[in-house]
């Protein structure tokens, strides 16, 4: 295992969002994390997936992970999870719905 991927393994062992923020020494506002925790972590994972950690040393890998966390956190500081549409349920357009009371019989 290279040192770049070792940083990822270290992060995978953490179980709480706050632990990840602390491990990467990234400041955060608890009220933002409490409201958008799952969304921030999902977006963080998306940003991490776009980075090739294999050739990176430990310091560069930690900096890249911190940058990814910073970007994910910033996405939710000034906007809501609904606006960011991280999860499929928010991104998927709702189906058209016509209630039965909205139907009428037209006679010719």
From Swiss-Prot:
Pfam family, one: NifW
Keyword Transmembrane: no
GO biological process assignments: nitrogen fixation
InterPro entries, sorted: NifW
Record keywords, A-Z: Nitrogen fixation
Family: Belongs to the NifW family.
Function, in words: May protect the nitrogenase Fe-Mo protein from oxidative damage.
Oligomeric form and interacting partners: Homotrimer; associates with NifD.
Name of the protein: Nitrogenase-stabilizing/protective protein NifW
Gene (UniProt): nifW
């Amino acid at each position: 295992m290279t040192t770049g991927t070792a940083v990822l393994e270290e992060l995978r062992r953490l179980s709480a969002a706050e632990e990840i923020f602390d491990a990467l020494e990234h400041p955060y506002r608890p009220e933002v994390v409490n409201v958008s925790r799952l969304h921030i972590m999902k977006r963080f994972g998306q940003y991490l997936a776009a980075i090739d950690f294999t050739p990176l040393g430990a310091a560069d890998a930690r900096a890249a992970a911190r940058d990814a966390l910073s970007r994910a956190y910033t996405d939710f500081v000034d906007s809501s999870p609904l606006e960011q549409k991280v999860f499929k349920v928010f991104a998927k357009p709702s189906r058209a719905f016509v209630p039965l009371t909205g139907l009428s019989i037209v006679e010719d």
